[in-house]
């Protein structure tokens, strides 16, 4: 199979990896309440943290990131750099819209980082540094994610990584869409801050 013919396969590989709901799996194994019935109902690490189980939240964050990295590396090995990028897109879509959960998944921050690690790891370091700085300054996890994701494709483009910049610009648009409720709460002044007691 040639590199171009492999691209649809890479998309499927990425989607299947991305659709693994680590947050839901880990919380069920730990015997906690169904993740979809608490907090935001989201299956990501932030909502897992609302169970009070920091270890589970860390495991979810790691699992969600690594599934993006794994999809990219495996597809890149089998089909080359274009396949790696397509797999990254597939992993992101799988995380956001997993078929097993009626297309209701996470918001994409951890898998965004994982895809960056697989495709261009310095970009992942940049994303994390921006996230940390923004979270420290404003104490909003959602703001930190939005700022880091908007700046990442700009920096990739500025350093000549135009194909990666285009991919991550698309992922950023999807990530912003998934944070639309957070944006509404920010506008209303009701978004919860990091460390705030609910």
Curated annotation (Swiss-Prot):
Entry's transmembrane regions: 6-26, 55-75, 83-103, 113-133, 154-174
Keyword Plastid among record annotations: no
InterPro entries on file: G3P_acylTferase_PlsY
Any one Gene Ontology cellular component term annotated for this protein: plasma membrane
Biological or metabolic pathway of the protein: Lipid metabolism; phospholipid metabolism
A GO term for molecular function: acyl-phosphate glycerol-3-phosphate acyltransferase activity
Designated name of the protein: Glycerol-3-phosphate acyltransferase
Organism: Bradyrhizobium sp. (strain BTAi1 / ATCC BAA-1182)
């Amino acid at each position: 199979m040639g590199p171009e013919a492999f691209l649809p396969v890479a998309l499927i590989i990425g989607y299947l990896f991305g659709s693994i709901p680590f947050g839901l799996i880990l919380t069920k194994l730990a015997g906690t309440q169904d993740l979809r019935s608490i907090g935001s109902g989201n299956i990501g690490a932030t909502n897992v943290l609302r169970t009070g189980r920091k270890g589970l939240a860390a495991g979810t964050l790691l699992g969600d990131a690594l599934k993006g990295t794994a999809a990219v590396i495996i597809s890149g090995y089998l089909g080359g750099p274009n396949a790696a990028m397509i797999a990254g897109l597939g992993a992101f879509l799988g995380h956001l819209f997993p078929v097993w959960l009626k297309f209701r998944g996470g918001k994409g921050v951890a898998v965004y980082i994982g895809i960056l690690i697989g495709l261009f790891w310095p970009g992942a370091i940049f994303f994390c540094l921006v996230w940390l700085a923004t979270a420290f300054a404003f104490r909003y996890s959602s703001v930190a994610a939005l700022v880091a994701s908007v700046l990442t494709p700009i920096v990739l483009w500025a350093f000549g990584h135009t194909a990666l910049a285009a991919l991550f610009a698309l992922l950023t648009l999807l990530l912003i869409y998934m944070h639309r409720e957070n944006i509404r709460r920010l506008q209303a002044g009701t978004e919860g801050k990091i460390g705030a007691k609910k």
